[in-house]
Amino acid sequence: SHPDTLVFGRTPPLINTIEDRKRLISRLFGIEKVLFLPFDRAMMTMPWQDFIDDLLISTYGAVHLVAGHDYHFGHRNQGDPDKLLSRCRERGIGCDIIPQVTRDGITVSSTYIRTLIESGQMERAADFLGHRHCLTRTVTHGCRFGRTIGIPTVNLTPPDHVLLPARGVYVTRVFLPDGASVPGVTNIGTRPTVSDGDAVSVETFLLDFDGDL
């Protein structure tokens, strides 16, 4: 879960799911194995020294750490980049601190990227993310009305606590389970092809596609 869930009792919307994040890290950086550690009360109250020594080095065998310029860790966020660098030197492992990154004079941050996605500025969001925003979900079979008008549609159930772009219609590309991809047009909002009340849905019209999902 997001640290804010435990610390502040609220869950901010995530930019993507854990599964999507793993795939992105593997694809963009060539990392074969990605582990996400659950943030629980034990981790929240762990002294920053123990976080490095016992968890990262002893448990996971870390030999090189990479962190952002504003990274904080350990009980009450007492660990910071300077302490991380110093501790890594003492323990004989490598450490890199990534400096602040700006684009057009704006600091690249998850908070700003969330703002762009929420307002539907997907081109600019992609520029700050370094890749197109993506969402992986299992197809929800509906009434198959799209097929009756010659355009197959894919209905996706929005994941909990994951940020969706502003309501609207977007040009998209759909990646299928077999690795193929097809162009699509995605509507986020109430479903235009069938009445579904006020429930927010993600409905994609598949172009140049003839098959079953």
Describe each PLM feature range.
Residues 1-58:
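Core alpha/beta nucleotide-donor-binding catalytic domains of modification enzymes
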Residues 17-34, 134-162:
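Short N-terminal signal/transit or membrane-insertion segments
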Residues 18-23, 58-63, 90-92, 120-123, ...:
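Glycine-rich loops and low-complexity Gly/Arg-rich segments
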Residues 25, 125, 172:
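A residue-level signal for conserved active-site and pocket-lining positions in enzyme catalytic cores
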Residues 39, 100, 188:
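Active-site donor-binding loop signature of nucleotide-sugar glycosyltransferases
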Residues 42-152, 179:
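Classical nucleotidyltransferase
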Residues 142-213:
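Phosphate/ribose-recognition catalytic cores of enzymes acting on nucleotide-derived substrates
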